[in-house]
């Protein structure tokens, strides 16, 4: 049986992490990414009928770090594995190889992205379309995920739970995290190459043109949002109802970790999304961006739900190393490579 190099932990996994410091960002990012890759490989194990300790390639992606996959999330239509729950259990005799245990997770809920194989591609693309149309919350995959996360958070609290996902799976992790964060629990969230549904303005080389387009977009988006809000306000006044709390601002104390590559047009717009807020503050019209940043122009015109990709605060990590092509820029393996250069910034919505 032909084995893909990307599935083989001994060839492409983070083998250098023989001891873990849970306070180290590179270690945390690498472990979270490896667990997500474990879900990808679990699905490919299923499709290729690689079963048992001799053939299955997925277990080592988690067991190398002393995690065990205790539950698989299975799609109700095609039986594909789209996510799972890992439990961390470090053997007592190995406790000396791990530092900062207070920052370790007890459970990690991980989600894969699209698998371009015949057994799962149609169902995955269906969910990709749900992301585009801001309808991921209506899917049975989300119902399975959010119920599982709620149960775990109720049992052990939010601080012991991590969410992690790549591409489509990053959208699922962010949506699940948003939903839980609104209940007052702030789980760690590792979103690798999360889709940002917007024109790829970040690709424009001329900074003045790029900034001008962003300002114009912000003004239009903020104007439409305020007009919509005014209409709703008058409607509520007619019924003597109080204005609802701002759901976007309620998430401002939650800092999901976003990992983006400028060469990946599906997620690179996050760089401009957060930097543009600072620029708008500098020129004195930050109030416009505080309204615009909560809304998607396309979403408002289509009348959709709140977009998954719009986040008030974040810890944004950018891979500054060049990628040879889109496939590499969008891949999960880049996030545990030692030779890549990363830049991390914290953005807080105020």
UniProtKB/Swiss-Prot annotation:
Which superkingdom heads the taxonomic lineage of this protein's source?
Eukaryota
Instruction: Report whether Repeat shows up as a keyword of the record.
Output: no
Per the UniProt entry, the Enzyme Commission number(s) are: 3.1.1.-
Q: Does Lipid metabolism count among this protein's keywords?
A: yes
GO MF terms on file? hydrolase activity
GO BP terms, alphabetized: lipid catabolic process
The record's top EC class is hydrolase
Q: For this UniProt record, give its keywords in alphabetical order, as a comma-separated list.
A: Hydrolase, Lipid degradation, Lipid metabolism
| Gene3D superfamilies noted in UniProt | alpha/beta hydrolase
The text of the family note is: Belongs to the 'GDSL' lipolytic enzyme family.
The entry's protein name is GDSL esterase/lipase At4g10955
Source organism of the structure? Arabidopsis thaliana
């Amino acid at each position: 049986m032909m084995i893909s190099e990307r599935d083989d932990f001994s060839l492409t996994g983070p083998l250098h992490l023989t001891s873990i410091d849970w306070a180290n960002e590179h270690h945390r990012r690498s472990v979270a990414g490896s667990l997500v890759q474990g879900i990808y490989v679990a699905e490919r194990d299923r499709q290729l009928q690689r079963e048992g300790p001799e053939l299955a390639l997925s277990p080592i992606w988690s067991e190398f770090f002393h995690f065990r996959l205790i539950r698989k999330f299975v799609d109700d239509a095609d039986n594909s594995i789209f996510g799972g729950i890992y439990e961390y259990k470090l053997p007592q005799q190995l406790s000396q190889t791990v530092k900062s245990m207070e920052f370790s997770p007890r459970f990690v809920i991980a989600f894969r992205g699209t698998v371009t194989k015949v057994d799962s591609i149609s169902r995955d693309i269906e969910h990709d379309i749900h992301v585009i149309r801001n309808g991921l919350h209506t899917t049975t995959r989300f119902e399975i995920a959010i119920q599982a996360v709620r149960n775990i958070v109720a049992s052990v609290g939010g601080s012991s739970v991590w969410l992690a996902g790549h591409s489509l799976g990053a959208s699922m992790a962010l949506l699940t995290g948003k939903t839980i964060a609104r209940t007052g629990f702030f789980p760690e969230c590792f979103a690798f190459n999360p889709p940002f549904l917007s024109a790829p303005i970040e690709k424009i080389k001329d900074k003045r043109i790029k900034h001008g387009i962003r300002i114009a977009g912000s003004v239009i988006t903020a104007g439409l949002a305020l007009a919509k809000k005014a209409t709703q306000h008058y409607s509520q006044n007619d019924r003597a109802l109080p204005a609802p709390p701002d759901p976007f601002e309620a998430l401002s104390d939650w800092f999901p970790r976003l990992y983006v590559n400028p060469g990946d047009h599906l997620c690179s717009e996050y760089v401009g999304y957060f930097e543009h807020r600072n620029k708008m503050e500098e020129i004195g019209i930050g109030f416009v961006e505080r309204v615009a940043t909560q809304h998607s122009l396309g979403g408002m015109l289509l009348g959709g739900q709140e977009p998954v990709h719009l986040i008030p605060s974040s810890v944004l990590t950018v891979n500054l190393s060049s990628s040879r092509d889109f496939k590499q820029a969008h891949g999960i393996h880049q996030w545990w490579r030692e030779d890549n250069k990363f830049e991390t910034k914290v953005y807080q919505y105020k």
